[in-house]
């Protein structure tokens, strides 16, 4: 489990200053200590940063790359892309490889206006108009609220800022979940999406085998007793420093690599070892216990439903019915492209196969047999095997 890795990390880090361990450390990548705006500027791209306030009061940080390094002199509006990250991540992970291998930068260089959101509750979106992050009520959200409030709020902001009525949506993992919920329940929002690109879509969650699923065997009462009812896996500076040391060591980086395999599936040859410290330093960024319980609900119920509040009375209060509503994927009309990984132990090929017949607007599907759950954003061969296809589909559905 995550806490076992972190404990081991801290114990090992206590020895790093002894003997020759320091001689085995690679030079730390400067992006380890940078936020998203700083990473963008460091790579030579224009950076803009905005705060978006949702209808229910959450203040979300959104980053923008308005144009690429090769399009600085061109004028006129560019097609807009919005990117939504996975659980425990932030929007920096669209940019954590070198510029020629990061989807956010490649899209900007291909002529797109790139926007990247941060989900409520992560390090960069942990503010509210009236609530404090110490309030339990602040953390009473799951991907339901991210779909109902965050995504519409951010898209409205982008439309107003750019003057463009339609945009492309790219989601990874839980980012796809947010998109599918929003586009299947809000037709007016769906009409603003030119195409939905789903990378490792987390909808069916019946067959995961990764280490994180062991956590879902615990009763809700135990999870709440251990982790409380507020934030979950929030960013910790001491852990960040420790994990950076481990992942940057020429021998001990294998611990990071092995943990990633347990979490996401094995495909070590496709990960850039020299960037391991960057990957680990930007995660976890946190979410809510409430959100984790909703994902656990998907695992146990095998149904794509809204959050179950645990009793008929509370469900009636939230949904005007005794059971949480099922999200009907067949109602989504947005043209959709899906990529799945054959070695993905979190979103398995079996689970992806189960949802394909429900997506009536599926225009493209590809299974990458050797990919794990992280290859969609960090894979060395992602630019050739997937990113080029995304750009080609965008041009086809312009």
Swiss-Prot record:
Entry EC no(s): 3.1.1.13, 3.1.1.3
Domain AB hydrolase-1: 79-379
Active site residues of this protein: 173, 344, 373
Presence of keyword Phosphoprotein: no
Domain of life: Eukaryota
GO cellular-component term (any): intracellular membrane-bounded organelle
PANTHER family membership: LYSOSOMAL ACID LIPASE-RELATED
Biological processes per GO annotation: cornification; lipid catabolic process
Record keyword Signal present: yes
Pathology linked to this chain's protein: Ichthyosis, congenital, autosomal recessive 8: A form of autosomal recessive congenital ichthyosis, a disorder of keratinization with abnormal differentiation and desquamation of the epidermis, resulting in abnormal skin scaling over the whole body. The main skin phenotypes are lamellar ichthyosis (LI) and non-bullous congenital ichthyosiform erythroderma (NCIE), although phenotypic overlap within the same patient or among patients from the same family can occur.
Annotated family: Belongs to the AB hydrolase superfamily. Lipase family.
Localization annotation: Secreted
UniProt xrefs under Pfam families: Abhydrolase_1
Catalytic function, reaction form: a sterol ester + H2O = a sterol + a fatty acid + H(+); a triacylglycerol + H2O = a 1,2-diacylglycerol + a fatty acid + H(+); a triacylglycerol + H2O = a diacylglycerol + a fatty acid + H(+); a cholesterol ester + H2O = cholesterol + a fatty acid + H(+)
Signal peptide residues on this chain, from the entry's feature table: 1-18
InterPro entries assigned: AB_hydrolase_1, AB_hydrolase_fold, Lipase_euk
Residue ranges that the Swiss-Prot or TrEMBL entry lists as coiled coil: none
Gene3D superfamilies: alpha/beta hydrolase
Name of the protein described by the UniProt record: Lipase member N
Function summary: Plays a highly specific role in the last step of keratinocyte differentiation. Contains two distinct domains: the alpha/beta hydrolase fold and the abhydrolase-associated lipase region, also features the consensus sequence of the active site of a genuine lipase. May have an essential function in lipid metabolism of the most differentiated epidermal layers.
Enzyme class: hydrolase
